[in-house]
A protein has these predicted regions:
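Metal-dependent phosphodiesterase/phospholipase catalytic core, i.e.
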Residues: 6-116, 124, 163
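C-terminal active-site rim and adjoining tail of enzyme catalytic domains
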Residues: 41, 123-203
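Short acidic, Gly/Ser-rich segments with clustered Asp/Glu that frequently serve as metal-coordination loops
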Residues: 1-3
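Alpha-to-beta junction loops
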Residues: 21, 118, 185-188
Length: 203
């Protein structure tokens, strides 16, 4: 069962130890995934992807970052999207609610997901944007282009946008950088502290 966690192991963010791939969900669901951050979050658990897709379907557009290189994970994601009726409500190149997108640093996984789940938008994560990566997205109908924030300037935004790609960023460190990102014309950003961002001030 796919779970939602950043690392390949549970060591850093739970009271357990071991690789995710070697554990079943019953074992994973017993772990304390909050106390490392603050004792008041001791009841926090690692959620399954199914739980997230079910709970947040009508609340937000869900962006799934695929970290594993297993084909089975993409196939399972498609099954879950069908189960929760995401596919019938999805349009390409949009952040519809309900809706879901798939992103990854792994080019082969983006291509595989695009093949298995062609109905939804896909995006490529990267550190350094290059012409080759722009071409990769254009040639494979990958609509999202997501470099590390500090590698983005106005020329890149114009170049990518003029070619029909949607550009966003990851790696922002503070609210001031969120303001900078939207002034640059980015379509979205990834942060670890969404509660600090006033969305209305960015519109």
């Amino acid at each position: 069962m796919p779970v939602v966690i950043h690392d390949e192991t549970v060591d850093r963010t739970t009271d357990g130890s071991g690789e995710i791939s070697s554990m079943n969900f019953s074992e994973i669901s017993l772990l304390d995934a909050g106390s490392w951050f603050d004792s008041k979050y001791s009841d926090q658990k690692i959620p399954s992807l199914e739980q997230v897709l079910s709970r947040y379907k009508d609340i937000c557009h869900i962006v799934v970052e695929v970290k594993s290189e297993e084909k089975l994970l993409i196939e399972k994601l498609r099954e879950l999207l069908i189960k929760f009726d995401y596919m019938n409500n999805q349009t390409q190149n949009s952040l519809d609610v309900p809706g879901v997108s798939v992103i990854s640093f792994v080019e082969s996984q983006v291509l595989l997901s695009k093949e298995i789940i062609p109905e939804i938008p896909h995006g490529l994560l990267m550190v350094q944007p290059t012409d080759d990566l722009i071409s990769f997205c254009l040639n494979n109908n990958i609509s999202g282009f997501f470099p590390y924030f500090k590698m983005i300037d106005s020329d890149l935004v114009k170049n990518v946008t003029d070619k029909g790609l949607s550009i966003g960023a990851w790696g922002l460190e503070n609210v001031s950088e969120v303001d900078d990102a939207f002034r640059l014309g980015l379509k979205g950003v990834t942060v670890d502290w969404p509660g600090q961002v006033d969305i209305n001030s960015l519109i």
